[in-house]
Amino acid sequence: MAPSQKRKSLPDDDFIHTISDNDEPDILDEEEETVPAAVAGRPNKKARTAGAGAVKGKKNKKEKKGKKGGKSAAAGGDGEDGDEEEEEEVTGLWGANDADDGAMDSDFEFVAGGGGEDGLSGFDEEGWGFENAKKGVVGAGGAGQEVKSGVDLDEIIRRRREKKKGKGLEKVEEEEVEVEDMGEVDLDLDDEVLAEDGFGMGMEDGEGGVDEEDKGGEDDDEAASDNDSVATPVQHPDDEASEDDDEEDAEEEARRKEFFAAPEETENVGKKGGLSSFQGMSLSRPILRGLTSVGFTKPTPIQAKTIPIALMGKDVVGGAVTGSGKTAAFVVPILERLLYRPKKVPTTRVVVLTPTRELAIQCHSVATKLASHTDIKFCLAVGGLSLKVQEGELRLRPDVVIATPGRFIDHMRNSASFAVETVEILVLDEADRMLEDGFADELNEILTTLPKSRQTMLFSATMTSTVDKLIRVGLNKPARIMVDSQKQTAVTLAQEFVRLRPGREEKRMGYLGPYLQDPVHRTSHYLLQAEEDCSPDPDHLRLAGAFEHRAPWKHEPGSAFRDGKVNYLLATDLASRGLDIKGIDTVINYEAPQSLEIYVHRVGRTARAGRSGVAITLAAEPDRKVVKAAVRAGKAQGAKIISRVIDAADADKWQDQIDEMDDEIDEILQEEKEEKQLAQIEMQVKKGENLIKHEEEIHARPKRTWFETQEDKKKAKELGRAELNGVRDAMKKKGAGRLSNKDKKKLDSKAERSESKSTGWKKGRAERDGKGAVLNLKKVTKPKSKAPAGRKGRR
């Protein structure tokens, strides 16, 4: 460093300049300004060698300054004598009296924000903990401030409630309390364990047909079976194909054996290390300290099997139940390998891709906390955060980049300082979702750009084993690690099903009412299938104290829910994958999902990491097939399955109360519309001012490019939505939310054709000609029936 060079160049009898001398007062400030914010917490050699003398060094500085001032005053301002006296007390460059000169970042202050001794004391209460993501948000006042939303619907509701408090609404509140008490009694009396003849039961381990209903005979059973065949939901393409391992195609099984690494290799790696604890995995001390500070004392099964294999650099395809610690399973080996990286030249070596930005934020939080005792740098690149801030972080070439596919491609194409040629590890979290059609184009663009010699790891709770999909990722003899059977829920999860009789599907909110006021379920997480399907319901639930899940750093419903300010969190399938929200005891499916895979992800938001939880599903007659699949999977693992019956009269009372909110909701929506218009006008005015003020800078910016057109992006979005929610959701728009029997039969036949890989079904001549076999058959039979009539007429 500069001080040591000055000591060698100057003679012994001359005074020595130090960093605290007045003749060079700006050296420290310049060094602090040039150090980037991302590197501020990085320990260095100086910090490691300073030790406990840092505190003493500061005290000695003050004493030196005091002595220097006293001597200079006594000598009439002779600075040289003061400096010579100061030099006599210095024992060495890094001695006890010169331990911390202020020109370094202390190793004991690398955790920003405090919290506890290790900065992680509040980990259990923080949940997502995306404070680092907030730093990248640019608001009206610049970087580091939160984005101010244009219109806050919850604030409008609060204002209306405050106005009504002064108008004598105490009587209404008393009536609501009485209704709440009635609902609790009925709810407790109707709880019963799901019987063999209940809705969704009667499914033996080896059977897949429709059995008898609650009280029906043979006639009722035939009608129910016919209704089931007409109104069954569309399954995921891989749902039926992978439902039973015994029915798998022999050819596909042979391809898997050739594609995946031999199971013996995986088992041998697991047996070599004592995997009952993290200490037996030969992990470095900084990694062990990070695991201990977070509260990880014993590896989960997926962690015990994955970490040793990932440390060897092999490709991994991993699957385990929700809440089993899959994130730490790939973060820990990544951190361990990065500890031995060359540090002279900063290089981006790891890329983690997630399907949603909320999951990316959570993964970033977990990784930064596990790496809190290391010098590994992370960057979060997701939509909704400032591009400029992210470009600045990527310019420093962080070790790990956690991103969503769209924003990663944006930086890859338009950020000149961001290079991906040195990436050594690629991780796809929730890989089965990433391999769907909605992400196909983006994932292909990323995979063709990254180096082919990389290590690739795929993880999901419903991991696909289809070789055709996995080949796209470019895996090289991956180790297949499936800890639990696929589509399996946690053992500590109790599953409840509320049956909606035919004709009562429109009164779902009435059946949901008792749960809104049930004190047993004061912390509930509502997952709705799609926003369009429940467009009026979010407003009703807001009046009941619920929040709709949006970007957490904007509206922060997760923080309000976690802090107990609200009791309900309304969310779509966007939040059904991967998110670990603290405090969720109950998950309520307002509508049954389209497939068992989505059901497993939804109910996996509770009963995580060994905790207990409850999953409640409001199931109508068209949901029978999914319910039976869920019940069968639950029975196979010994889970508790309950059938809950809510009296129709009570549901009607709740529905009437909810319908009374319609007028108030219309007024709220009108007020929201007016505020949105005002916010839009303000934004346009601000935009015009910026165009005039920064015209030259705006025109000087290079135009951002994309690898596909807007039409291609729209098609990809529609494909992703269709695969997530099923084709049935798109066809509902034709019949105002209802499907005709003809459309239902078309969808069922399409679902059967999608199962051709396992059943061996092939298109016939009629299908190849573009006409269905049934339609072609009708054309053939018509001439035969009309021919005799024509001959009689001629005679």
Swiss-Prot record:
Biased composition (Acidic residues): 21-34, 78-90, 98-108, 172-195, 204-225, 240-252
First-level EC class: hydrolase
Gene3D superfamilies: P-loop containing nucleotide triphosphate hydrolases (3.40.50.300)
GO BP: gene expression; ribosome biogenesis
Residue positions of motif DEAD box: 429-432
Binding site for ATP: 320-327
MF terms in GO: ATP binding; ATP hydrolysis activity; RNA binding; RNA helicase activity
Domain Helicase ATP-binding: 307-481
Organism superkingdom: Eukaryota
EC number from the UniProt entry: 3.6.4.13
Intracellular or extracellular location(s): Nucleus, Nucleolus
Region (Disordered): 1-127, 162-276, 703-795
Domain Helicase C-terminal: 466-684
SMART domains: DEXDc (SM00487), HELICc (SM00490)
GO cellular component: cytosol; nucleolus
Catalytic activity: ATP + H2O = ADP + phosphate + H(+)
Sequence ranges of Basic and acidic residues compositional bias: 710-721, 740-756
UniProt keyword annotations, A-Z: ATP-binding, Helicase, Hydrolase, Nucleotide-binding, Nucleus, Ribosome biogenesis, RNA-binding
Basic residues bias spans: 56-70, 779-795
Subunit structure: Associates with pre-ribosomal particles.
Function: ATP-binding RNA helicase involved in ribosome assembly.
PANTHER family, per the entry: ATP-DEPENDENT RNA HELICASE DBPA, ATP-DEPENDENT RNA HELICASE RHLE-RELATED
Recorded family membership: Belongs to the DEAD box helicase family. DDX27/DRS1 subfamily.
UniProt comment concerning the protein's domains: The Q motif is unique to and characteristic of the DEAD box family of RNA helicases and controls ATP binding and hydrolysis.
Name by which UniProt lists this protein: ATP-dependent RNA helicase DRS1
Organism: Chaetomium globosum (strain ATCC 6205 / CBS 148.51 / DSM 1962 / NBRC 6347 / NRRL 1970) (Soil fungus)
